[in-house]
Amino acid sequence: MSKIVKRKEKKANDELTSLAEKIRAKALENQKKLIEAEKEGGSESDSEEDATAEKKKVLKSKSKSTVSTQNENTNEDESFESFSELNLVPELIQACKNLNYSKPTPIQSKAIPPALEGHDIIGLAQTGSGKTAAFAIPILNRLWHDQEPYYACILAPTRELAQQIKETFDSLGSLMGVRSTCIVGGMNMMDQARDLMRKPHIIIATPGRLMDHLENTKGFSLRKLKFLVMDEADRLLDMEFGPVLDRILKIIPTQERTTYLFSATMTSKIDKLQRASLTNPVKCAVSNKYQTVDTLVQTLMVVPGGLKNTYLIYLLNEFIGKTMIIFTRTKANAERLSGLCNLLEFSATALHGDLNQNQRMGALDLFKAGKRSILVATDVAARGLDIPSVDIVVNYDIPVDSKSYIHRVGRTARAGRSGKSISLVSQYDLELILRIEEVLGKKLPKESVDKNIILTLRDSVDKANGEVVMEMNRRNKEKIARGKGRRGRMMTRENMDMGER
């Protein structure tokens, strides 16, 4: 009997191996066609030179931006050709050159001048527009003259975004001796307390963990804070950080404090927050409605029932060699699809809320370093993360609200680069897609599909998916068993303690 089982397992493994080989062969064929087409000049090059040329082309077209608020900036087309025009300290100008910041983006052109003058700022801009540097540059420029500890505090909704903001400050402040620290949940509080006692200039934090340290870390306070930044403020409020923000705002000083509020969208909650925390702010907006950048090509793929996994593998094969983020609605789907991709020899890693901080940063590092070409993620990755050169975004699950769609597809076509998004649409997603198209103000074109390849892949992909689901179920059972074992040991110890009493 065991021999029969082994033969069946061997046959299944052979079939999966055969599928992977077929996919690799098809991928090599696609790559060969692409190379030949490039030689003939018939297709766009994905080389770094072409990306740079595309970027320059986009930057040459003036961005139509608006500024309207309590303090009006009436020059709607104001722009700068270089950061030296902003009258920054030489060390900061050189850091911008080192980072290949060729010229200020529209939001930077709008926000940095009034920020340098000392105004509070409300910055509204679409994702990928350079919001982080828009508030980091004026803070660092002022810090060069003051050099005080606990000088600025930046609040971010997620641990990943906080870490990326820290990286931006460290890079821009590399020639200025800037000390920064990242204070987020999921990490050791004692280690963070020691970092705070070293009196960094810049603190980047999630609201909950910052409040923990303000209440419990001896010797730490923000009484002399000069700058407060709330980045992705709409997300902060969506994640119900409102009560914590209120407590933080009551603790930190209001006099001699400059406050910046940056967000992708303006809502009634944001308006309430800015009235509570900002004084006569300048509102700098380069986008006052949900929209996507012109360099993003958005399409959809109509998927028959039960074939979504097959269509996904079809896409991975068609776009082999491209960097891709696949968005799912659930953590379980993120794990399952990551496993499916890897089983079929597409290098993938998962990012979702069940991972601890080290696991999440590890997944991001693998993807950013190019060691994994596919990131399968829930919406935890959709906001604020600066992941360079993402070629394609795939919506495996359609988001339930249009705002989430905008933020997801905003992971590609950043900073003037071109990019593509593809949404897999089943019959149950039609209403969601109609809402998204209404917000975008256009119909999304359909992606073409080779039905013969779909039919060829179907059985093998279903079988591979079954293998992944079985493995996930096995791991879950082991996890539950370990949990019961621990609870059993704890109950035994409690019974022994009761016996002693």
Curated annotation (Swiss-Prot):
Catalytic activity field: ATP + H2O = ADP + phosphate + H(+)
Modified residue Phosphoserine is at which positions? 43, 45, 47
Q: Which residues bind ATP?
A: 125-132
Motif Q motif, residue numbers? 81-109
According to its record, what are the GO cellular component terms?
cytosol; nucleus
Q: Where is the Helicase C-terminal domain?
A: 307-461
Q: Does the keyword Mitochondrion apply?
A: no
* Keyword Methyltransferase set for record: no
Give one GO term, molecular function aspect: ATP binding
Q: Which CDD domains match?
A: DEADc_DDX47, SF2_C_DEAD
Write down the EC number: 3.6.4.13
Chain ranges of the Helicase ATP-binding domain:
112-284
Q: Which residues form a coiled coil?
A: 3-44
Give the region (Disordered) as residue ranges.
Answer: 36-79, 480-501
Where does the UniProt annotation locate this protein? Nucleus
* Highest taxon in the source lineage: Eukaryota
Q: Where is this motif: DEAD box?
A: 231-234
Gene Ontology terms: biological process? rRNA processing
Chief localization:
nucleus
The family annotation for this protein states: Belongs to the DEAD box helicase family. DDX47/RRP3 subfamily.
Assembly, per entry: Interacts with the SSU processome.
Entry note about domains: The Q motif is unique to and characteristic of the DEAD box family of RNA helicases and controls ATP binding and hydrolysis.
Q: What is this protein called?
A: ATP-dependent rRNA helicase RRP3
What is the organism of origin for this protein?
Saccharomyces cerevisiae (strain YJM789) (Baker's yeast)
Quote the gene name from the UniProt entry: RRP3
